[in-house]
């Protein structure tokens, strides 16, 4: 799954490589990141290596990194999962380095990948899940055109309370209607 060009004006976007693993592990293990994920377990180097081998050889999952063009700093990781070429849909997600949040990078990465998935890969539907407490992400997803499709009520225990897991989806026709 080759990407068009190599990113955006501010970001180099490419497949995750072994040289990225330590920074990506630190991002995953950061408390602010874990609060937003469905999986709350810290990852060791050994666990990450096994995971990397699996995702590197997968036909249905990919991981990409976004790095700032000016200094090669890691901005975030974009997840593509459950890629179903027969039904033309996939699940996506992103983790942004805490110091890089609220600077428009998540929107930039999502817009880049949505263009790619709908225009180049011919996907019909892109979906994601997020926690109700992740209000910034929910606002971004709605801004991008994602629609809430359902909830798993009180499915996730975070920060001392149960909260819903929100399923959102975006269809190609909805994306094209927004972007022309």
Predicted features and spans:
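A short, well-structured alpha-helix characteristic of acyl/acetyltransferase catalytic modules
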Residues: 1-50, 174-180
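Terminal substrate-recognition subdomain of acyl/acetyltransferases
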Residues: 2-3, 154, 159-180
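Acetyl-CoA-dependent GNAT
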Residues: 41-101, 171-175
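Conserved G/P- and acidic residue-centered "switch" motifs that form tight phosphate/ATP-binding loops
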Residues: 72, 104, 134, 160
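Conserved acetyl-CoA-binding loop-helix of GNAT-fold acetyltransferases
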Residues: 102-116, 135-143
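Conserved GNAT acetyl-CoA-binding A-motif
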Residues: 119-129
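Conserved catalytic-core motifs of GNAT/GCN5-like acyltransferases
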Residues: 127-130, 147-163
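Conserved active-site tyrosine of GNAT-family acetyltransferases
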Residues: 141, 146, 168
């Amino acid at each position: 799954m080759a990407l068009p060009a190599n990113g955006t004006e501010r970001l180099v976007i490419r497949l995750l490589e072994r040289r990225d693993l330590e920074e990506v592990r630190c991002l995953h293990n950061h408390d602010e990141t874990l609060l937003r994920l469905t999986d709350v377990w810290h990852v060791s180097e050994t666990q990450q290596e096994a995971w990397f081998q699996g995702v590197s050889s997968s036909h249905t999952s990919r991981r990409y990194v976004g790095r700032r063009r000016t200094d090669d700093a890691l901005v975030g990781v974009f997840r593509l999962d459950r890629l179903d070429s027969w039904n033309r849909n996939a699940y996506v997600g992103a983790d942004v380095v805490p110091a890089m949040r609220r600077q428009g990078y998540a929107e930039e990465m999502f817009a880049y990948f949505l263009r790619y998935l709908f225009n180049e890969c011919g996907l019909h539907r892109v979906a994601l899940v997020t926690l109700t407490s992740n209000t910034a992400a929910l606002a971004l997803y709605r801004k991008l055109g994602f629609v809430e499709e359902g909830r798993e009520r009180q499915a996730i225990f975070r920060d001392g309370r149960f909260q819903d897991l929100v399923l959102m989806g975006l269809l190609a026709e909805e994306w094209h209607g927004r972007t022309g």
